[in-house]
Every structure is written in C-alpha cells, then in structure tokens.
Amino acid sequence: MAEKKLNGTVIVTYRCNARCTMCNRYKAPSRPEEELSIETIKKLPKMYFTNITGGEPFIRQDLKDIVRELYKKSDRIVISTNGFFTDRIIDLCEEFPNVGIRISIEGLQHTNDTIRGLENGYNRGYATLKKLVELKHPDVGFGMTVQDLNAPDLVPLYKISDELGMEFATASLHNSFYFVEAKNIIRDRPMVAKNFEDLVNELLRSNSPKKWFRAYFNHGLINYIYGQPRLLPCDMAF
C-alpha cells in the first residue's frame, strides 16, 4: 500500500513586523519559547506539500533549519511572507533553490503600506520579487487579500505580475482564528465584484490554460463575497 501523505500548513511564529488592518495577530504574538521547535517538526508526518507561514516566518532566525528538516518529509515547500526581509529571503533561496516564495502585496505602494501599516513595505516586497526574478528563482509569486480599499488595484497588480512572469494569487477578505479578528467584512460588494470581473476578463485574454483556471477561481470569489456557495469546495480536514 502506498504511503499516505498530507498537505499541511506549518505556522512557525505568530510574531509579525506588519500591522495589517485585517489582522490583529501582532497584538498577540507568540513568545519564541512557545513556537514550534525543530524537535517537534521532526515528528510531523510525511507531506506532499507544506506551506510555511506565520506571523512573518522570516522573523525566525532558525528558518533555514526548519526548511532543512521539512525537506526530509515534504515533496514541496512554499513560504508565505510579506517580503520585507529581502536579504534573509535571498540567502535562504540560495541554499534551497527549489523552495517556493509567495509574497503578500496588498495593493500599489500607498494602498499596500496603508493596509499593512508597514513603512516602505511595498518597495521592500517588490524589491524582493525583482531580486528573485533576477536570480531566476523558479518558484516565486505574489498575491493579495482583496477588500474595499485595494480592489481597484487588482488589475494593476496582475499586470505587474504578468510583466515579471510570475504567479498572481488572490483571496477575498475573511476572518480567521489566527488573525485574532472576527469583524472583517466587504462593504461595497458591487464595486469589489466589478474589479474581480475585470481581473477575470484579463486572465481570459491570456493563452495560458492555467490563467483560465485562475479566472474560474476568481469568478468563484465573486460568489463567495455575495455569500453564495463556493465553486471550488474546500476539502481541508477531510
């Protein structure tokens, strides 16, 4: 019988250098001694795919050790980050050239820095993306959590990703236990939906079947913000 593997998310810290408007995690950070240890990570099961997230993962000074240990049990690893710690990210990618990097950018410069409460956050994140492209890192992309404030930046950010030749992922504003926030809500749903429609049309103009699938996914997000059933059901925990 084939060995059963999982897809998993490893939250390596609840510390974060950003102050995002949709996330209060920075108000309740973990203490370093509370965070997952290397010994605990060694006990994790085999996985097809592992997402390393936080908090901001690159706050952990031993992140390389964590990645090294997870590669013993995971076929693919992607790290979610705000991209602020450029030197640390590049250093890790040079040692682990197959690791995926996904940088969260919440809009163009003013919008991103307003939402993230992180001075120079956009410039630092974009500089990290550019550096990874220059180094020809094979698995890099960025994405945004769409809300009222940044919806008009959806298509401009997609065009930046297209120029850089990288993945562009989207999510709709939502609540989560690790956000320590339960009041996130999209208020101008028609406006946000219209910007999603514009993105869908841009994606469908592509010759890439993968972008056509992303168009379908983003169409599903319109359903989601109107409280309708998801087109792609979530099967986590099943």
Predicted regions and their residues:
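Conserved alpha-helical substructure of the radical SAM core
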Residues: M1-V99, F177, D188-N195, L199
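Radical SAM enzyme [4Fe-4S]-AdoMet core and its adjacent flexible, acidic
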Residues: E34, E69, K73, V99-E106, ...
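Generic low-polarity alpha-helical segments
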Residues: T40-K43, C234-F238
